[in-house]
Amino acid sequence: SEDDGSASPESQEMSYTELPCPSICPLIYAPVCVEDSNQDFYLFVNECEVRKCGCEAGFVYTFVPREMCKATTSLCPMQTKSS
């Protein structure tokens, strides 16, 4: 059979649903840029902050090289998930 469940995903798109969500991130300045499905860019202080946002807000994103980053905000788009 072709589909044995071990195929790796083709895209780099990620969303994190691990529980509990990371609540505290290290105070490390290692900026990462991501792009969401609306082609909006976000610049986060570090990868942990991206994962925290992804987990808490259901934020789906793709990592983008810094030189291609057109980020206008560094805030997590919390409003994407209605609680």
Swiss-Prot record:
Keywords linked to the UniProt accession: Disulfide bond, Phosphoprotein, Protease inhibitor, Serine protease inhibitor
pH dependence of activity: No decrease in activity observed after incubating at pH 2.5, pH 7.4 and at pH 11.0 for 1 hour to overnight.
Biophysicochemical property: temperature dependence: Thermostable. No decrease in activity was observed after heating for 1 hour at up to 95 degrees Celsius.
Coiled coil: none
Residues annotated with Phosphoserine modification: 8, 11, 15
Disulphide bridges, residue numbers: 21-55, 25-48, 33-69, 53-76
Keyword Acetylation: no
GO molecular function terms noted in the UniProt entry: serine-type endopeptidase inhibitor activity
Highest rank taxon of the organism: Eukaryota
Record InterPro entries: Kazal_dom_sf
Role description: Serine protease inhibitor. Inhibits porcine pancreatic elastase with a Ki of 58.3 nM, human neutrophil elastase with a Ki of 3.6 nM, cathepsin G with a Ki of 153.5 nM, chymotrypsin with a Ki of 26.7 nM and subtilisin with a Ki of 0.68 nM. Does not inhibit neutrophil protease 3 or pancreatic trypsin.
Record-given protein name: Greglin
Organism from which the protein derives: Schistocerca gregaria
